[in-house]
A protein has these predicted regions:
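Flexible coil/loop and intrinsically disordered segments
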Residues: 1-147
């Protein structure tokens, strides 16, 4: 969606998020299920997703997709955080200790960013909050300059 590669299977126009996560997810899955494994886009998406998950496992603390909580409390995985931070990881190209430190610092920045945290906890599925979340993520991607 952020890269403008998904196509709405009903309208054949670029898919846009309109505050209805069920509809958006359904259309995205229909689009993805139409791709053949030999398709270049399929291969690229598979590669990006795999790398993002490998980076998450390697660099994030245990429970890394959970929002901060009080000691002794364990919050569930936050899906909006999972999707947006995974998107950030999927866009980065880099290796080595310095790159890993940059990713970990970015993670910590986000955990202290009130606007980002608000977008993960209030009206999470609204278009306004979704766009705000990805605006913050895209700005960080640009600042990291590792694409």
């Amino acid at each position: 969606w952020q890269q403008h590669i998904t196509i709405d299977p009903d309208t054949h126009e670029p898919l846009d998020y309109r505050s209805n996560v069920e509809d958006f997810l359904g259309k995205t899955m229909r689009f993805l299920n139409q791709l053949e494994p030999e398709n270049g886009l399929f291969k690229e998406l598979d590669s990006r997703f795999t790398r993002a998950m490998e980076l998450a496992i390697q660099l994030l603390p245990s429970g890394g997709f959970r929002l901060p909580s009080l000691p002794g409390k364990k919050r569930p995985i936050n899906m909006a955080f999972f999707e947006s931070f995974s998107y950030l990881l999927s866009r980065l190209n880099g290796e080595g200790k310095q790159f890993h430190r940059q990713v970990q610092n970015t993670y910590m920045q986000l955990m202290c960013n009130d606007a980002y945290l608000d977008s993960l906890t209030r009206s999470v599925d609204s278009g306004k909050q979704t766009y705000k979340r990805y605006e913050i993520i895209n700005r960080l991607i640009h600042e990291l300059n590792l694409c």
